[in-house]
Swiss-Prot record:
Assigned keywords, A-Z: Cytoplasm, Nucleus
The protein's assembly and partners: Forms a complex composed of PRKAR2A or PRKAR2B, GSK3B and GSKIP through GSKIP interaction; facilitates PKA-induced phosphorylation of GSK3B leading to GSK3B inactivation; recruits DNM1L through GSK3B for PKA-mediated phosphorylation of DNM1L; promotes beta-catenin degradation through GSK3B-induced phosphorylation of beta-catenin; stabilizes beta-catenin and enhances Wnt-induced signaling through PKA-induced phosphorylation of beta-catenin. Interacts with GSK3B; induces GSK3B-mediated phosphorylation of GSKIP and inhibits GSK3B kinase activity.
Gene Ontology cellular component terms for the protein in this record: cytoplasm; nucleus; perinuclear region of cytoplasm
Protein name (database record): GSK3B-interacting protein
Lineage of producing organism: Eukaryota, Metazoa, Chordata, Craniata, Vertebrata
Length: 139
């Protein structure tokens, strides 16, 4: 499994309070996956074209589906479970049963593998945040 990373306090851009972002799924204690999926979407919406929790795919305590369109205009259907996130389809609201894609512990890791433009947007957002911290420290 590849190395996951967690952004340094991008929470101010995503609208979440400090400490509320998903670092992984261990200890989630079978939380409502729709709530988890909404948090995932809000955390990285700045770095993709479109991303939303599916309204037509079944949601349960242990699974939710997220549709994402990358900045490269590639569409994916993602499955969110206690195991993590994985691609299950290459169109919105589509599950291709034959796919054997790996699970990713974080949305950052998954998008990093799917979208070079995500990496660039993430890097730019991180740089802006660091520059803001530097300015605040010099005041």
């Amino acid at each position: 499994m590849e190395t996951d990373y967690n952004p340094v306090e991008l929470s101010s851009m995503s609208g979440f309070e400090e400490g509320s972002e998903l670092n992984g799924f261990e200890g989630a204690d079978m939380k409502d996956m729709q709530l988890e999926a909404e948090a995932v979407v809000n955390d990285v919406l700045f770095a993709v074209n479109h991303m939303f929790v599916s309204k037509s795919m079944p949601c349960a305590d242990d699974v939710a589906y997220i549709n994402v369109e990358t900045k490269e205009r590639n569409r994916y259907c993602l499955e969110l479970t206690e195991a993590g996130l994985r691609v299950v389809g290459y169109a919105f609201d589509q599950v291709e049963d034959h796919l054997q894609t790996p699970y990713h512990e974080t949305v950052y890791s998954l998008l990093d593998t799917l979208s070079p433009a995500y990496r660039e947007a993430f890097g730019n957002a991180l740089l802006q945040r660091l520059e803001a911290l530097k300015r605040d420290g010099q005041s």
